[in-house]
Amino acid sequence: RMARILIIRFSALGDVAMTIPVIHSLAVQYPQHEITVLSRAVWQPLFQGLPANVGFVGADLTGKHKGLWGLNSLYSELKAMHFDYIADFHHVLRSKYLCLRFRLANKPVASICKGRAGKKKLVRRHDKVMENQKSSFRRYADVLEKLGLPVLLNFSSIYGEGKGNFAEIEPVTGPKEDQKWIGIAPFAKHAGKIYPLELQEQVIAHFAANPKVKVFLFGGGKSEQDVFDAWIAKYPSVVSMIGKLNIRTELNLMSHLDVMLSMDSANMHLASLVNIPVVSIWGATHPYAGFMGWKQLPVNTVQLDLSCRPCSVYGQKPCWRGDYACLRDIKPEQVIAKIEGLVD
């Protein structure tokens, strides 16, 4: 029997990207069901490559769906779609309210268990418990299992076994030929996750000097653009992608990279959706918290063993030592070696 499944995850970009391997697996394993994703409208392009039984509803949380009135009108829109199951992958005030309304209407609802206690033990300053926590992918899949929809996570790429259509990006990137393409996404939301820019510049300088390699910089916003402009002036072979691509074409380009260097950031998760290796740098945060990119190998992480790490699940806490040694003490040579191990 065909069932209609609603999956809720509003933000942030990295977490929304992490729903894709789970939703893709669900769609393929339950082709008879209709799946609808409720998220912020801006993330819709992420879901375009999914199987035909996946639809999307964009929430306008700063406009018509703002506040209690807005949520009630959003609920009315959803109610009219006659869902049989509601899977809350977010479990924040907004999604809890929608789920309450669905529960009152007698619909089966399941919500994510965030595993806060285990994460807390991981980041506390004293008596840390260094245990690998369940990944977000597993937590999302657990929500579906509670609804009687167990899923085997066997996703490889939004492009299946291939890559994005190169003709779509070639006008921006030029031909690839036998060059090695390296993507670098040097930023993250918080200082505790950003490898110091002067050290990242040494990594860029190293690869920019090699004519067989092309470096693409990924980022967004004015301050990041200023940093990129300064780097490009020094290293003319390096290309900034700011303002040149949308989410869809950015994923396409990522699929043609040989390796991506990123922080613990959304770009790590986007690159992981197109089946390329990611070298990820970890400071205040740690892969043990469960936010490692899909199918990324621990051997491709760069991180230091410090007794204070990790100090934060999301990286927003300022460094209590004051020196961000967890990032500052990573040598550019370590990062270069990891990247070269993957492109050679």
Model-predicted regions and their roles:
Residues 1-344:
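Catalytic machinery of carbohydrate-active enzymes
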